[in-house]
Amino acid sequence: MQPYDVKLDYLGKPWCTVPLEVGHNEIGDADAADWAELTDAGELFEAMGFPAPGRAPLMPLDHQVAQKLHAVSGPGDRARDLIDLQLIDARAEVDLAAARAACRRLFSYRRAQAWPPAIAKQKGWDEMYASLAEGLPVLQDVDEAIRWTNEFVARIEDAR
């Protein structure tokens, strides 16, 4: 992924900056999309006088899970992926066998760490995780979240 800051103007004046990550099709993750109706966003757009955006293409969940597990198992500040993975698992039906195949391909392709990984707490994760998890329907303790994520990895690895 290549991160960019996109600066938006409104009525000719600087308005805000939004982060954008652009990636390339590493293992077929962009070959097919899961389409989602943007009902809530459509209502907001229409309330502001804009046309509803309709459907949006999303990366398939098995590939999202693979990318998040790869990110959270490497060095760095990806404590947010612990939260994302819990939310994905709670709100969607993840095909664990497809996720296993995507994880094996992605980890092999990137050659940074082995599949299946062991998730370990990184420096700064206690504070980062606590601030991000507050008010969300996820485990509130980072150590519990890491334990849960390692169990999630085991469930994926056991799927056939």
Language-model-derived ranges and their functions:
Residues 1-160:
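Structured mid-to-C-terminal alpha-helical surface segments
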